[in-house]
Amino acid sequence: MNIVVCVKQTADTAATVTVEDGKISWGDTPMILNPWDEYAVEEALRIKEKHGGKVTVLSLGPESAKEALKPALAMGCDEGILVSDPAFASADSLVVSKIIAAAIQKIEDVDMVCFGRASVDSDTGMTGSQVGRRLGWPTLNLVAEITALDPQGKSISVERMLEEGRQQVRASLPAVVSVVKEINEPRYPSFMGIRKASKAEIPVWSKDDIGLEEVPQSAVEWPQVFAPPKIEMVVEMIEGDTPEQKAVKLADRLLEEKVI
């Protein structure tokens, strides 16, 4: 099977976000592979190990986004591709989906595209569905398990994790699959894998390389971003010899503050 895993470079989850000159700033925070995408990479590798084939990891972003591809290569992906162009700088998720779909079509003969559930920075979870729509392929979201896969018969069966329970779904291949963390436990890259990934040559595709003559403008613009105002809080400890005494004092204070 020929599988493409779409990943994103995000800031470390321990980062402190600040607002500078009306824009979000990550400061000197290290950038990492989006944690949700590790599960998509792992699942693609497991499919390859069982059915054979090739796993290509694809990312969209500046030149620095190559660093998000290297952990996936270290885990075992065969090839990494970065799609980067100054024209993509202000792309929203809808424009991003058009760019990614064009890159996937350039790769050709793709059987499956895998996404993580969402990115930890924007957390919209829309890009996978939008890419599936542009490709005209079935899209399976919130996948917690791939229960059956038939590369020859071009079919896939999955179990989706919904708020009210689980749902069994079957679709034809090629398909777009978005996974949740319950699907697997991502492997740790080996030392040799890390060394190999550090030396890997990652091609960069521009808008011309993927056949986009024009890049649509984002429908939404963020002219300025505001930091929420700081809230000063005063904590009052309710004391008492017994839980009952504390409860009475707490109720009295809430009545005084007209909370109840």
Spell out what each predicted region is.
Residues 1-260:
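N-terminal glycine-rich FAD/FM-binding segment characteristic of electron-transfer flavoproteins
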